[in-house]
Amino acid sequence: TNIDLSEIISLISYDQALTYQLLKAANSAYVGSVSRITNVQEAAYFMGKFKTLNLLLACAFGSKLRNTKLPAYEEVEGQLWRDSVIASITAEQCSKVFRLRIPPETACAALLLNAGKVILSRFISDEMKRYISERRLSGRDQIQAELEVLDTHYVELGGIIAEHWGLPPEIAIGVKYQHDPDKVKKATSDVTHVCYRWMEFLSSPASSGNGEIKINPNVIQRLQPSSKAWFEVMQTLVKERYQKVCGDYGLPEQWLLPKQWAFDERGNDSMNGAACA
């Protein structure tokens, strides 16, 4: 990989907020620490390079993402942050519901799945946005519409950004192939595909009857679910962890709750299970 742990430690050591968050994470019951950790170097080595990198990315972009809204993608303020956090949490929890070993870089890749959206939203013209919207209305999905108008799309651009930043190759692969994991058949891109579909599922209106998560069946076969109830287990794990993260950031548990969860909170069954498509 292109990033050394000592470089990450150097970045964190001179930032009070990052140092606090790293020490807090390393000493938390969630990580499973058995003894108190008191310095950045010890905390980083204890957590490992990729968990530390994930924390660095989350802290560096968290406040910006919470205040960002993307009208071009019909996303309200905070939705980009929410989806990025849920994607990263989903990647972390995949090791609990799938038998295949999940690479440690995967949570970092999941956190950056929508990075390309931010770039496109800033630099494409209103006219191009209108053309994309027209193609969406005619039945294309977001990626097809962008490809027809721009000859690229936000997923491909996100992969290029990850490569440009010098992030580990597995992270770039996870970002770039989230939509088409069969092209590379890597565990990282298989998991980010699950994360991509998970965000799509949670953001869809539950009242519309769309209570299934549509995942490439080849991905499920490669990841090897540990039980037939993997979807329900994942739903519970991700929801509980997301609410804890909201608490850590001082946000209400119901803050910007995904539509599927909000619907379920009202006493309706929105978890119909997983579908392969």
Residue ranges: model-predicted function:
Residues 3, 39, 75-76, 140-142, ...:
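General structural signal for secondary-structure boundaries
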Residues 126-137:
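Post-HEXXH active-site segment of zinc metalloproteases
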Residues 1-127, 142-217, 255-265, 276-277:
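Conserved alpha-helical "signature site"
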Residues 213, 217-277:
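Terminal helices and disordered tails flanking the catalytic cores of nucleotide-processing hydrolases
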